Amino acid sequence: MAESVPIPEPPGYPLIGNLGEFTSNPLSDLNRLADTYGPIFRLRLGAKAPIFVSSNSLINEVCDEKRFKKTLKSVLSQVREGVHDGLFTAFEDEPNWGKAHRILVPAFGPLSIRGMFPEMHDIATQLCMKFARHGPRTPIDTSDNFTRLALDTLALCAMDFRFYSYYKEELHPFIEAMGDFLTESGNRNRRPPFAPNFLYRAANEKFYGDIALMKSVADEVVAARKASPSDRKDLLAAMLNGVDPQTGEKLSDENITNQLITFLIAGHETTSGTLSFAMYQLLKNPEAYSKVQKEVDEVVGRGPVLVEHLTKLPYISAVLRETLRLNSPITAFGLEAIDDTFLGGKYLVKKGEIVTALLSRGHVDPVVYGNDADKFIPERMLDDEFARLNKEYPNCWKPFGNGKRACIGRPFAWQESLLAMVVLFQNFNFTMTDPNYALEIKQTLTIKPDHFYINATLRHGMTPTELEHVLAGNGATSSSTHNIKAAANLDAKAGSGKPMAIFYGSNSGTCEALANRLASDAPSHGFSATTVGPLDQAKQNLPEDRPVVIVTASYEGQPPSNAAHFIKWMEDLDGNDMEKVSYAVFACGHHDWVETFHRIPKLVDSTLEKRGGTRLVPMGSADAATSDMFSDFEAWEDIVLWPGLKEKYKISDEESGGQKGLLVEVSTPRKTSLRQDVEEALVVAEKTLTKSGPAKKHIEIQLPSAMTYKAGDYLAILPLNPKSTVARVFRRFSLAWDSFLKIQSEGPTTLPTNVAISAFDVFSAYVELSQPATKRNILALAEATEDKDTIQELERLAGDAYQAEISPKRVSVLDLLEKFPAVALPISSYLAMLPPMRVRQYSISSSPFADPSKLTLTYSLLDAPSLSGQGRHVGVATNFLSHLTAGDKLHVSVRASSEAFHLPSDAEKTPIICVAAGTGLAPLRGFIQERAAMLAAGRTLAPALLFFGCRNPEIDDLYAEEFERWEKMGAVDVRRAYSRATDKSEGCKYVQDRVYHDRADVFKVWDQGAKVFICGSREIGKAVEDVCVRLAIEKAQQNGRDVTEEMARAWFERSRNERFATDVFD
């Protein structure tokens, strides 16, 4: 007998064992445990001690039906309370399992499934018509709508029963009962065995009430069929009339009820989840999205979808397979050992012990899928490659379960999913309602995206009525109306001027704010912004009957998240596709990204012209490194854009109305107002990390229950303006502290309108008070006074003095109002000048491996004398954070960092080199904390070097004790550079000096395949890049090769995001 090795397991507590490992996100918890403890681990859950396997090699072993069989000892024992001996929850030796299996398998044969196509198409068209009639501005809850699709399709095709889900606002009560039943099944499975039953009296009553409701619906379906018999050959007919060829028996009425509930649950939950995840993945991956739409257009065209088309869609099939690999709605399945056996040749599993195959990790095994296993790449699932993977790595793709207990309805679900994908992408363009949406998971026994909303815009300029004819097979609408009608599809409420469309590409909100500013300015120049929206909304829908203005930025050379689909579509254009489009482009960027500065706006500008578009005015641009974005934009508006548009479209001075600003009423009733674009979190703890000098602080935050993150991600904070700054506004405009404002606006605004809202709320939460004044702002101040000296000085500041005295010193409108008391600016005009409050992103400085429900931030407090000479310059977000204490609440959202800025998936093989200074240490602390958790769980890791720069070990050596502890564990080797104590850091003053000093060690781990992470200010990023280039030259010389600096820098750029990942900030 082989020698047994203990199965790794986390430390537990008496009685409850490892129950404390679980939060409200059990899937995330299990993934974390697998990442921490490796491919096999055990949990102690009261009297249970299940084993979990997460690598392909071990999952392949437990899929051997000679050694393991399906278990009902897990959560399925609770599900069985509701469906008893239905196919999914029956024991294999129960007579009804074999009987039902033999009777029902023929009902899912190829010809039967093919015959269900017309009814599947019926329900799919109902979904399309709902999307079309709600219009492009209505957010669509994907999980809700695909749940309706899957439930109605299954009920109609399998049982000839209609739930009419698309004709009701609320979902059928069966859905809520089913969801609650499955959730409570999971909860019951995790109950401590010693907990008395009376604690769960209400939950138990609800549980059995839900079961009763589901049974009543199933009985209703059966009764309807019995009342109106038919010769349909569907699933229900097979249940009612089928005879088991082996026993000669029929299914009992009770078993039919159990089977119906089983199919209604399993048949729609998984399909709706798959389609929702597929939509998410495609919207996150524009290239794959484009290929799906191209395949639909080439195979199906504009006509009706036929069943014959579904076998000619290899790429969409690959998309569904890849979706099921990364986001399988069934995340795991349980088995039990038939006899004593060894896994991996060394881990003893005793007869009857439960082993759970964790697909959420097995499906991303880098041994099978490579180091990009976490990425959505449908090409790896095309037929030939899919077959190769499954041959070389058996059981590497198991979303439909295992062996004879695998999903019986797989052919049904596959045809339904293919059809839904085709009709949707044939007729609509989709965008995320929130382009920064980070995937949230809703988990019962299956998973699906939570709070995932999309917008659907009809393609080809169709109206809903025309779509209805197309879906009915009555012919496609003419494409000649494409862009003119598209403009109508996108129209907002139009004003009285010449219509124009404005689109933006924006991650941080700056370009969106500029676009809204442009829309507000339009009426005063004779135009009306009928459309203001993200660039993705303009995909295949660029208007031809009005000027189009595009405001966009680049992010490391890539398009903003809400412009990626537009850019991919635009790059695929041919010939003179844009010959009827008249456009103008404004570019935002930062010149420190030399290689990619303004890349995306330049690409838009040149490509539209190349494809026949008419450039209305020269492209405008702003460089955040040297000037103020808002000032540059307003200058382009006033000097270039509006004069050019007015000349092109013959707008007279009479048609140019006055500025449509804000109308503000002041009142004093007390009322609260909330902001809802982020979620509420709770401060757990905070502390100051430095002993003197510039303060660096640490804050620990309890996340909302559905929010998850990875080490290296960002936390977006919606701050409040400092009370001292808000007080200055109140003094300047003589507002009482309990004043309320009622704001009315004829143009787009992010301010709350038509309701009375606290003035304090408005100025603290909705607007930026410290944004530098623009030239237009300053000239508006000059118009609001009759004092000649004030006018003269303000006009000087708006002229040549602006670049020296306003922009670099960040002089705000409020600063100028205080400096020039003779300016009588109305509060409405002041509010109209202010940009909307934006979120600030901070690198998370912890790992979920430490505690998935909490995270930490590490930041520098900005509070210094103002460069303008008026008071102090107080950082909005850092001041906000610094005043929070335990128990305070704040609004946050997790934002994923670039894919490159995460730990390697093969931590055992790939070393890391981390370089940071000051609070740039934040994400790297998260990395090392994660490595420490892995080591504590018994994992073996590749080396890690951390180079860290600060001032003095006695003052600002951040987290020194933690890193000392982690060094002793072997999680990291720390090399420091003290700028004011070089005698304690090998004579090295700055972090780049220490990297060069220790170059022999750097070369050693680099040759082992190390990945380099750099985090800090732009100056640090540039200095470390320089030393890396220097090291590359020296390394080449050691190997006998001559490499110039230019060649070395080119190599560094090629390696960026592959072996070098940077995260720099201002």
From Swiss-Prot:
Residues 1-480 are annotated as: Cytochrome P450. FMN binds at S506, N507, S508, G509, T510, C511, S554, Y555, E556, G557, C588, T596. GO terms for molecular function: aromatase activity; flavin adenine dinucleotide binding; FMN binding; heme binding; iron ion binding; NADPH-hemoprotein reductase activity. One of its GO terms (cellular component) is cytosol. It is an enzyme of class 1 (oxidoreductase). Gene3D superfamilies: 3.40.50.360, Cytochrome P450, NADPH-cytochrome p450 Reductase, Chain A, domain 3, Nucleotide-binding domain of ferredoxin-NADP reductase (FNR) module, Translation factors. It is a peripheral membrane protein. The record marks T270 as: Important for catalytic activity. Its cofactor is FAD; FMN; heme. Its EC number is 1.14.14.1, 1.6.2.4. PROSITE patterns: CYTOCHROME_P450 (PS00086), FAD_FR (PS51384), FLAVODOXIN_LIKE (PS50902). It is found in: Membrane. In the N-terminal section; belongs to the cytochrome P450 family. This is Bifunctional cytochrome P450/NADPH--P450 reductase. It comes from Fusarium oxysporum. The gene is CYP505.
